[in-house]
């Protein structure tokens, strides 16, 4: 990592040597994917020596989701709109499952020539989709330097924006789950619980429209607390259904 940083710094400051040392010796800008909320998840960090590879497992956000959009990005910023788009494709054929159950491994592999191969594989079926791209194509040294300087200038704001969007995504997930549980297991609610949960849900929904990530986080926590007894009854009912008709020896 230190060697890669030294090479990159030299390239940005010493024009005379740019013909001798290629940008392809290291990854000049981080490579990643778009995730929920328009955020960038970096898989290969800037200044990684090549060839190199990295993989990460992602999942679905909604029940019954059968496709996963893969948006490949380049850059150091935290938001999609502030990074360079390299490629897009969709992995189709994911078996319908509850949200969060599917497992899709996305692998980035950069060869010695700087060619990036991106492969997405749904783990239960083996369904695979891939694409190749050359990240350095059409990118000048000056543009790379400007992107790096831009990321430094906006580092603090980017962190705050990322935290806000992460909390908004979590708020959306929690609200979808709460609505699902109320719809499917409302009969398990006790006196006053529905009103308390719906009030907490309204609070989360309203704060998620604002810009206070801490307030959103606190509202999500309050919803979790208000729904805890109800959720425990839902889980206990599910466990009883699973063990019904089975002896202890079977487990």
Q: Each predicted region: which residue ranges?
A:
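Oxyanion-binding/catalytic loops of NTP- or PPi-dependent enzymes
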Residues: 1-251
